[in-house]
């Protein structure tokens, strides 16, 4: 797969539309609490400015119900971009209203226009042709630098790309980096290759598990999803989260791992609580002695030790999903220990998924990871072996 990249097309002096992913966390006062996604986009933006482009930026933010909602406005993003880029950012009043289209038309070389939240337009998530066409009419070049939404066939991600030929559209630096990194990890990892898969549900990770089994040497399963596997093995799991309908799938995955010689690790103990509550009575219990009616909300210390030991000989580690309810301090120890173990490893370490990226930031391990993906669902679909709609549009067709 050969990806068209921004550095390989002529953008000098052109009007460029860049789809970014500025969907950053904010507190109740509209202060940005983590601007990593904004900082990640700066390379592409600066490259365009250095090439005398006039730049139109677009992104979604949150899930507005339809139409303008102040709390979902991109104004705080414009302010942060102004600080980071040290230049004025023109804020559009809408996405494709007449005033916005006029601002885009009059944009001069070196100037930046930020469109309002793409999802204020109902047509964005429906991949509406009319909206795609209007967005495309604003610029001569289309750049997709939003890896985090490239698994979605939306107007500003996929629809718009149809109106540009392969010499006038490309992946931005961030997008190209993410795609190449995941491609390399999945298809050409340095062994032993170990995957850590966590999070609450098996259903969300099923395809990824099936795709990983033939590729990895070991797979570690933690988080709420581990209980479906433990129940499949005949363990009593109390009131822990379980997807009974997926027990046959869990058995199939374990069977598959066994037949491929892949070592599959499950928790041997848990931090069990009487209720899903930060204040609930909790204690450490082995899997064999789960108190009746209690629920496991984190892996226990023996599991953390076992998993860390399993990681000790890794050359490549791919981690997607926390080991427990890390948002509650009492149930964050397991995830924190695994985070430290991954960070201290000599392996190439790749963290995918919003929760896991957030977790390694909280544990202070962010700088010790080789690569932290900006995309949760997108990185998962790449692991599943899918071609993302936003990426497909940027692939250079190679003649046989």
Swiss-Prot record:
Keyword hit for Kinase: yes
Keyword entries, A-Z: ATP-binding, Cytoplasm, Glycolysis, Kinase, Nucleotide-binding, Transferase
GO BP, sorted A to Z: gluconeogenesis; glycolytic process
Binding site for ATP: 205, 296, 327, 353-356
PROSITE patterns registered for this protein in UniProt: PGLYCERATE_KINASE
GO CC entries: cytosol
Chief location bin: cytoplasm
Coiled-coil stretches: none
Self-association state and partner proteins as the record states: Monomer.
Protein name: Phosphoglycerate kinase
Species of the source: Aliarcobacter butzleri (strain RM4018)
